[in-house]
Amino acid sequence: MGHKVNPIGMRLQVNRTWDSRWYADTKDYGNLLLEDLAIREFIKEECKQAGVARVIIERPHKKCRVTIHTARPGVIIGKKGADIETLRKKLANMTDSELHLNIVEVRKPEMDAQLVAESIAQQLERRVSFRRAMKRAVQNSMRMGALGIRVNVAGRLGGAEIARTEWYREGRVPLHTLRADIDYALAEASTPYGIIGIKVWIFKGEILEHDPQARDRKAQELQDGPAPRGAGGRR
């Protein structure tokens, strides 16, 4: 029986690209990598209530461009932009480069694996039944247009003495098909009985062209809806 590799890593440079997009000399690479990790960890803690799905870091010449994909941009921006300015200043202190901060709204959080996994984790921490949380997440994703979804939860489910793994799937999730657009995420729920791990796979369709940027464009189209006819480009 084969092991399941990370679907995102398997599809890099096929229909998905990296979340850190920069090049550095050997002597600078380690420092910039640690800086990236520190920025991501800080955003994860600082914007815990904002539903952060993805953080993209780009480094053009002597600049650092951070793009936060979030389900609740208003929580990050704050009243009259006060909170985002505070966040930008804190992030600027973590890097020597000129920092630019962008916020992108995720309009369909039910179609984002990271947000679905974190939603299940929050429900488990509130002592909601794991089966109910899994089923609700699967139904919401399928209703919003997913072609398939699988949810795994592992740990001392329901306070059981022995840890086990339960899963729920609807539709199809073709992990071996490289052209399949599969979003994957992992989250953890801290319960009185220990840590429960949640894994989510969401199948959104197939991307036929060999283009690392294709998934980002397709995700944006799913968020914005189909372009009107005659708006340019081939139909």
Swiss-Prot record:
InterPro entries: KH_dom, KH_dom-like_a/b, KH_dom_type_2, KH_sf_prok-type, Ribosomal_S3_C_sf, Ribosomal_uS3_bac-typ, Ribosomal_uS3_C, Ribosomal_uS3_CS
Region (Disordered): 213-235
UniProt key word rRNA-binding: yes
SUPFAM superfamilies from the UniProt entry: Prokaryotic type KH domain (KH-domain type II), Ribosomal protein S3 C-terminal domain
GO molecular function: mRNA binding; rRNA binding; structural constituent of ribosome
Subunit and partners: Part of the 30S ribosomal subunit. Forms a tight complex with proteins S10 and S14.
Matches recorded under PANTHER family: 30S/40S RIBOSOMAL PROTEIN S3, SMALL RIBOSOMAL SUBUNIT PROTEIN US3C
Protein known as: Small ribosomal subunit protein uS3
